[in-house]
From Swiss-Prot:
Xref: InterPro entries: AAA+_ATPase, Longin-like_dom_sf, P-loop_NTPase, Sig_recog_particle_rcpt_asu_N, Signal_recog_particl_SRP54_hlx, SRP/SRP_N, SRP54_GTPase_dom, SRP54_N_sf
Topology relative to the membrane: Peripheral membrane protein
Organism: Mus musculus (Mouse)
Annotated protein name in UniProt: Signal recognition particle receptor subunit alpha
Residues recorded with modification Phosphoserine: 177, 295-297
Positions contributing to GTP binding: 423-430, 518-522, 586-589
Protein family membership: Belongs to the GTP-binding SRP family.
Domain of life per record: Eukaryota
Amino acid sequence: MLDFFTIFSKGGLVLWCFQGVSDSCTGPVNALIRSVLLQERGGNNSFTHEALTLKYKLDNQFELVFVVGFQKILTLTYVDKLIDDVHRLFRDKYRTEIQQQSALSLLNGTFDFQNDFLRLLREAEESSKIRAPTTMKKFEDSEKAKKPVRSMIETRGEKTKEKAKNNKKRGAKKEGSDGTLATSKTAPAEKSGLSAGPENGELSKEELIRRKREEFIQKHGKGLDKSSKSTKSDTPKEKGKKAPRVWELGGCANKEVLDYSTPTTNGTPEAALSEDINLIRGTGPGGQLQDLDCSSSDDEGATQNTKPSATKGTLGGMFGMLKGLVGSKSLSREDMESVLDKMRDHLIAKNVAADIAVQLCESVANKLEGKVMGTFSTVTSTVKQALQESLVQILQPQRRVDMLRDIMDAQRRQRPYVVTFCGVNGVGKSTNLAKISFWLLENGFSVLIAACDTFRAGAVEQLRTHTRRLTALHPPEKHGGRTMVQLFEKGYGKDAAGIAMEAIAFARNQGFDVVLVDTAGRMQDNAPLMTALAKLITVNTPDLVLFVGEALVGNEAVDQLVKFNRALADHSMAQTPRLIDGIVLTKFDTIDDKVGAAISMTYITSKPIVFVGTGQTYCDLRSLNAKAVVAALMKA
């Protein structure tokens, strides 16, 4: 039983609707529009919303959307046939009204489609009932029944052939092991000569061995060296004392060499950092987050130089290109198949996950199928333009994270703004936490760093080093004696959730604006550590949960994000589990134009990329520019 069936235009006008079991179809259809149609995720024609399964079909020629909804616990095999039949009949019946494509004509039009729909629904249900059951194949008709007889016939003939081949190979191996270089005709004679001692005698054997040795040396050319080595090895070596190895920093070094403690000047470690402040800070405005720029001046100059030649080529070869024009033609899947295959391979080469590349190309095919092209548009340009629009739309997800605005809102409520960083091992969580701390300090917010990585050795010391250097960049003297950055740590082996709770309470009492919680790196399959992370997030309810991921990963990004979200949902004790809110993409300066990880991560989670790490100084932090990333992704 269907819950509803609705037909509406891409402009939002509902042309016709059938209400079955469900009272209203507004909520599920709006969720479909927000999550699938507007986000360019049309690779799969089904969508699940709460207890309903929605299937849809796009008519790109007339800009129509056909949606059917039913309970997801039901298995209705006739839904695909029904939606195709309704699409075909509705388009043919009201072609004149739809071709006007004006909102006023669609509003004034009367689409009496109830009786036709009920007839198609009844036919679809009956066809599914009377569908012929699949009959089991007989054993006599299968390949397995024919295989034993054929294999017996083949193996009898093959055994003799294999025996002959094996005998030949064994004979060749024996001849090779003896080192004979003579032909097959003379070989038996030589063997007989070797065996016949009375005819040849001992001298003949020596001559034969010497002759074979010379032939072997001439053939391989390395026997002389080996023989010389063997003669050298026969001579006994004079035993001498081994020279003692002198280590650069050995035990005999003096105390000055072994002293690794930081030099103290007037008892302040900040004075030792004064000469390295510019190196630590980096160049650029720290308080202003710049957009990511993936293009270079060389690429721009190349594109500018190629534009005139391209225009000349199109004008000069106009008549030769007329065969490739598809003006005033509706696109079909056969037309786009070869282009989409090239686009899919291009995306995979640019580090997009393989499954996501397939879904993107399928979404573009559904979007363009049946669409009438322009006069001088080719299939390649149309598909490429549609793919670029889809990629830009994916990188601009539903929610936009504005940390500065949210921190000011938390200040008005007199509470600290809490951010939790999570991710796998070695992706740069602590480093990018320090970059974000510097960015917040440059904007005038005080930061408390909570060292909740009680698992990895050296994690607390790493954060202590960052805190000391950030304090040197923003000393209390510049802020009226107020401590702008401080580390809250309780050592190793403690409960991370308890440390985070104490840090938030300490920040509230001391008046800190932001609390940045550093967590231990963990693999997505490590159940105990994922349970501890879910406990930390559930107990402390942070304002923002950021997943830190590398820009180097491809298919692994999909597995990491899916399993992190699944683990947070499974191990959470709350009724509505808290999932990942945003993404921090690190090591973006090491991938050139292979920026596909940004597409993979955003497509999987529908969450925005909040920050992008582009270097090793505190200023190397950027915000994502969707158009620049897509331009780098589509660059050949």
